[in-house]
Amino acid sequence: MKRICEWAMALLFSGVLLVLMAATILLPKNRYSYYENRNLSAFPEITPESVLSGQVFDDLETLFCDYAAWRTPALKAVTWADLNVFRRPVVNETVVTDDVLLPQLYDPAMSDDDIRAQANLVAEDNAALQKQVESYGGHYCYVAVPCQYVYYEDSSPAYLTNRSRYTDLELSALTEEMNAQGVCFLDMGPVFDSLGHPPEFSSRVDNHYGLRGAYETYRAAVQALNDAYGLALSFPEEGADVTFSALPNPYMGSRTRKLMGLRGNDEKLLTAAFREDIPFTRLDNWQEVASAVYALPATEDEALTYGLYMGGDIAETCIRTTAPRSPPPSSSVTASPTPWRASPITASTRCALSTCGTIRRRASATISPPISPTSSSASAITRRSSRAATTAASPDFKQGGLL
């Protein structure tokens, strides 16, 4: 009897493996993983070198893991168990609290002197960029916007790091260096605090700030430009010039997706509507596309991602308006320190934004009404943009960049 049981178990195990392998090979494949927000592995290139080094076998293992049959339901089941059975505080690199989903953080391996040295380098780079922008007749303002884990710093469990010391030291060092270099600098942290630090200014489930946060950032930046350069830029007032409305669709923020949609899907995204239509043309990577700033879904039940705004991350977007009250084109650019988001502002239209951000990647965008807190990246601190209203530098690792 024991021998029969052993044979039965071996046959059952072999049968399950055979079914899984057959299903993995035969079922339709999708290169994109929605919940992980990444492309799955491609079939590796087989060369004598990759075979001898063993790399091809590692790549094949990754490939089979990525395309394993019923992989998504299995991941969802494991995530559900971690959330509801084991009640882990950190699941899939996401800190789970009652009110907000935050990234799992680690203290950077940087000394205080390293932080100050980086701040000095960034300030020097931005001072040179400001001088270049002003030589074109433009206007420059560096806006530091708190990213999500800074905005919800107090929501992080006490037994996990929230980088508060690093954030405080970095911001104070950057502020001091920017002021010493004469850079027009705006810290949105105190501005948000003066407005009551409402949760709608920053997403609770994503590393982006909300449309109202973008609106208040733009208001403060316009005022900073007016004060610094003696301008008279106008601003669309809520109620009179612009109204916000929430879309009924469920919102799948990046951290919600990390949790397979099992937590944090009650947040709603906003859109802005202006009292007066402002005609504009849009160019993505210098190719003209449809004049739209929202990638609206077909139905109210379709889940939204942050790609609602501008259709997602695009290397370069330029929006040109012909608004009669627009001042002559002039420019400004910003970047941000590590836990703060970049928010470059252009003064070329009544309501335009130019975005930049993370070190090691480079892009730019100019956005005009309707307001969109879109995202893009900027150049490394050792590079300088030769074009006004494009990119600036950030000393950050992953968290820099406008949301």
Residue ranges of model-derived segments:
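Extracellular glycan-modifying ectodomains
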Residues: M1-L403
